[in-house]
């Protein structure tokens, strides 16, 4: 078993990674506070893993809430359902929430944990590749608003992240590919050696070879833990983790949450960011070609929706959380293995990149 730690002083917490972790009760019970537990999951994950988790927690008073599946339900209405379930059964601050599912479940349950009685403990049990390598680590919790993604939320750290890589065996191929967008992101912004490893081992990852999967997930979590330990609330280096997300969030909002998966939108956004960096001279054509080839090898889109024009992108991008003093700030690669936040990309530059990105 791999065990990492997010170093945040009194709010530090472990990340445990292994195949078959959800067969061992002590993995979960070591960080449960009190005797009451509420598991929140969705209609897809519940038939696969809910009963197993309930059995592991036989010594606790366990309740569960099963929510609809999908990004379309990452809303204040879903948040309110969790609040009501907790209130109706008189849960207190000694209750532990368990987020059993992908990124949507982790985000909305984390926000509920941050908000209920001003904060109760929660444990992340991510079941998708995207949530295992990214969203379960770092304490970003949120719901969407019709005008923008993740606009209502809080920074609130879990007590524990439990990553059972066997959960990926039940993941649909499209969801697995979407998770690879975040895996590739880490290589682009932080670790050129990891990027090269991904180029050499993508076929092993696609085949879900256990050793390759375990290494990729561990490396992503190492990078995420390092970044979050340096900058928990995204005032500095953590912003680099948003490579492709400003463009990607615009695609998700414009096309309707769930029609493009988050990872698919991030992949297309990553190519737009790479092409913006190319126009500025911060990457070479060869490096952009390598990024494109790796995304394609992971079965990810590399172009924006052809019907989505500059005006549609800008309308959503102006609401991005990284906007400061009215200036749009973009995360752009610097070669492969580094990235930067820039605030001087002109509308003319964006227009050229977006228009070419639709026709690529």
From Swiss-Prot:
This is 3-dehydroquinate synthase. The gene is aroB. It catalyses: 7-phospho-2-dehydro-3-deoxy-D-arabino-heptonate = 3-dehydroquinate + phosphate. InterPro entries: Dehydroquinate_synthase, DHQ_synth_AroB, DHQ_synth_fam, DHQS/DOIS_N, DHQS_C. Keywords: Amino-acid biosynthesis, Aromatic amino acid biosynthesis, Cobalt, Cytoplasm, Lyase, Metal-binding, NAD, Nucleotide-binding, Zinc. Zn(2+) binds at residues 182, 245, 262. NAD(+) binds at residues 69-74, 103-107, 127-128, 140, 149, 167-170. Catalyzes the conversion of 3-deoxy-D-arabino-heptulosonate 7-phosphate (DAHP) to dehydroquinate (DHQ). Binds 1 divalent metal cation per subunit. Can use either Co(2+) or Zn(2+). Pathway: Metabolic intermediate biosynthesis; chorismate biosynthesis; chorismate from D-erythrose 4-phosphate and phosphoenolpyruvate: step 2/7. It is found in: Cytoplasm. Its EC number is 4.2.3.4. Gene3D superfamilies: 3.40.50.1970, Dehydroquinate synthase-like - alpha domain (1.20.1090.10). GO terms for cellular component: cytoplasm. GO terms for biological process: amino acid biosynthetic process; aromatic amino acid family biosynthetic process; chorismate biosynthetic process. It holds the Pfam family DHQ_synthase. Its cofactor is Co(2+); Zn(2+); NAD(+). Its main location: cytoplasm. GO terms for molecular function: 3-dehydroquinate synthase activity; metal ion binding; nucleotide binding. Belongs to the sugar phosphate cyclases superfamily. Dehydroquinate synthase family.
